[in-house]
Design a protein with these regions (language model features):
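Mg2+-dependent endonuclease catalytic cores in nucleic-acid-processing enzymes, primarily RNase H-like
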Residues: 1-95
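Charge-patterned, long linear interaction tracts outside catalytic cores
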Residues: 66-132
Length: 133
């Protein structure tokens, strides 16, 4: 199995954790300029991907019922609230007219990012969607 953790803000602590579990733990750093496949660097214990694509993929997993959630409970309600706290918006560059989607945080999103990292780790094994290829 593989674990993906946020590389920020405590890079030193996350790097130590990844080193203790070398080959199984990867620090994630989102790269807004990256498109397509994730970049897994086994030596540096880093995975990079586009944040918007990653959040899109984790939401598709829920929407497409690739993940079975437990029965409705207070914890599942909190999970849903955190998932909804990352809202997708369309930005348009005033100068060029170029349009691009991105996610903005509207509230607590800890479960949203944790689920995205878990799906990212699982996608590397299963090659789920384009983001995991």
């Amino acid at each position: 199995s593989r674990c993906v953790i946020d590389g920020l803000p405590e890079t030193h602590a996350t790097r130590e954790f990844a080193q203790r579990h070398h080959g199984r733990v990867f620090m994630n750093f989102f790269n807004e300029h990256q498109r397509g496949s994730l970049n897994w660097d086994r030596k540096a214990m880093i995975v990079q991907g586009n944040r918007t694509e990653g959040l899109d993929t984790s939401r598709a997993a829920i929407r497409d019922r690739k993940v079975v959630l437990p029965r409705r409970s207070a914890l599942i309600e909190m999970f849903a609230k955190h998932m909804a706290a990352d809202a997708k918006v369309l930005d348009e560059d005033a100068d060029t007219g170029t349009k691009k989607y991105r996610y903005i945080r509207t509230g607590e999103n800890h479960f949203s990012l944790a689920f995205t990292y878990a799906w990212l780790a699982a996608s590397n094994r299963r090659r789920v969607g384009t983001w995991g290829r």
